[in-house]
Curated annotation (Swiss-Prot):
Belongs to the EPSP synthase family. GO terms for cellular component: cytoplasm. InterPro entries: Enolpyruvate_Tfrase_dom (IPR001986), Enolpyruvate_Tfrase_sf (IPR036968), EPSP_synthase (IPR006264), EPSP_synthase_CS (IPR023193), RNA3'P_cycl/enolpyr_Trfase_a/b (IPR013792). One of its GO terms (molecular function) is 3-phosphoshikimate 1-carboxyvinyltransferase activity. Catalyzes the transfer of the enolpyruvyl moiety of phosphoenolpyruvate (PEP) to the 5-hydroxyl of shikimate-3-phosphate (S3P) to produce enolpyruvyl shikimate-3-phosphate and inorganic phosphate. The gene is aroA. It comes from Chlorobaculum parvum (strain DSM 263 / NCIMB 8327). This is 3-phosphoshikimate 1-carboxyvinyltransferase. It comes from the Bacteria.
Length: 434
């Protein structure tokens, strides 16, 4: 077992907040400055699409004052209809967030546009994008399989909408809200199961929490959005990998600084604490409407197997599920997951990806349409095995963490895919080794 110790102030800036800060900046009137913008491939795809739509985007590297160099982004816009017709398809690469949220804006623009991506993104379902926008009067076409390319003939005459989210999805919620900003009147989104709420917070939208647990989000259309600065905290989804590293390591202690602690993003911490993980939260404060703090993680030799099935919990940990599954499998030999069909429509079929790789390492697994069970812990295979990453950053990083902590000799089919969300992933692991 390896030992990992140290303080980390170089976690990637939050991916979700970076996307939204740039997109909201493109809709605002004036100059939007974003400090600590993410350098991940997905967020850079959002900036590239905005540039291709005629938005002024400048990005520089500047000193942060604590020895770090951070990305500073400046966006200039004249408001909701500042976009120009693109001369070619808009390349979103691997970023589903870019494709889905930009579709909401482009549905309201008076021109034709086409959103495309890499081979992985072109297989992901986009009907959930098209359905609410068509209800608002948008002309949208998809492939026969309901996937990209997303071809949009936009209109400035979008109708208001009262939309019940059929699945908990922050991306779908956000694209409906972004489209509704352009509609003449008031729209409402009804959210039975909570998903991350950065869009509502950053736009200052009115929210109503009903006694039955359902949230209503109110959007008043065609109101000017004033430009304002954003400071992006560290990504809690990236923090999950370093937490797993510390929990699996021997005599390890890692402090993760300035992490976003938005309750809709850190449900995985509750899951781990309930299982006996040695996790602490310190120095909690508010920055830009988001709670931020430090996470302290220590080795844990008595972690209970993770069993996740509650719909709300699954929705709250959807991005962290691959890491939680691999962590539980390596630490306890067991894991159980249900009600997570959504995992099959991510960058890869993450249920199949996790199960196939665990089975390759000798774990006994059983797969279901909505989840899987890990039923036995083998002696970790210390001969080199190849992990198939499926072009999915979270699959690559989850198994890399387990290999580092367990001292297993695993080779990733694609190390570079980690750069989608965590460019300094491998360098950071090396810096924590003792």
């Amino acid at each position: 077992m390896s030992v990992f110790q140290g303080e980390v102030s170089s976690l990637p800036p939050d991916k979700s907040i970076s996307h939204r800060a740039a997109i909201i900046g493109s809709l605002a009137e004036g100059t939007t400055e974003i400090t600590n913008f993410s350098g991940g491939f997905d967020n850079q795809s959002t900036l590239s699409v905005l540039r291709d739509l005629g938005i002024s985007v400048r990005q520089d590297e500047v000193p942060a004052g604590d020895g770090r160099i951070v990305r500073h982004v400046v966006i200039e816009s004249n408001g909701l209809w500042s976009f120009r017709e693109p001369s070619e398809p808009l390349m979103c690469n691997n970023s589903g967030s870019t494709m889905r949220m930009m579709a909401g804006i482009l549905a309201a623009q008076p021109f034709r546009s086409e959103l495309v991506g890499d081979a992985s993104l072109m297989k992901r379902p986009m009907k959930r994008v098209a359905d609410p926008l068509r209800m608002m009067g948008a002309d949208i076409s998809l492939s026969d399989a309901g996937t990209a390319p997303v071809v949009i003939n936009g209109t400035k005459d979008l109708k208001t909408i009262e939309y019940l989210l059929p699945v908990p999805s922050a991306q779908v919620k956000s694209l409906v809200a972004l489209a509704a900003l352009h509609a003449d009147g008031q729209s409402k989104i009804i959210e039975p199961i909570r998903s991350r709420d950065h869009t509502e917070l950053m736009l200052g939208l009115e929210t109503i929490d009903r006694p039955d647990g359902v949230r209503e989000i109110i959007i008043d259309g065609r109101k000017p959005i004033a430009a304002k600065p954003f400071k992006v905290p560290a990504d809690p989804s990236a923090a999950c990998f370093m937490i797993a590293l510390g929990l699996l390591g021997e005599r390890s202690e890692i402090v993760l600084r300035d992490v976003c602690l938005n309750p809709t993003r850190v449900a995985y911490i509750d899951v781990l604490q309930e299982a006996g993980a040695g996790l602490g939260i310190e120095n909690v404060r508010s920055e830009g409407g988001e709670p931020v703090g430090d996470i302290v993680v220590r080795s844990c030799s008595s972690l209970a197997p993770l069993r996740i099935s509650d719909h709300a919990v699954v929705a709250g940990v959807i991005d962290e599920l691959p890491m939680l599954a691999v962590l539980s499998a390596f630490a306890t030999g067991e894991f159980e997951l249900h009600n997570a069909t959504e995992l099959r429509t991510k960058e890869s079929d993450r249920i199949e990806a996790v199960v196939s790789n665990l089975e390759r390492l000798g774990f006994a697994c059983e797969q279901y349409p909505d989840g899987f069970v890990v039923k036995g812990r083998p002696t970790v295979n210390r001969e080199e095995a190849v992990i198939e990453c499926f072009d999915d950053h979270r699959i690559a990083m989850s198994f890399a963490i387990a290999a580092e902590a367990a001292g297993a000799s695993l080779r990733l089919s694609d190390r570079e895919v980690a750069g989608v969300s965590f460019p300094n992933f491998f360098a950071l692991i090396e810096s924590l080794k003792q």
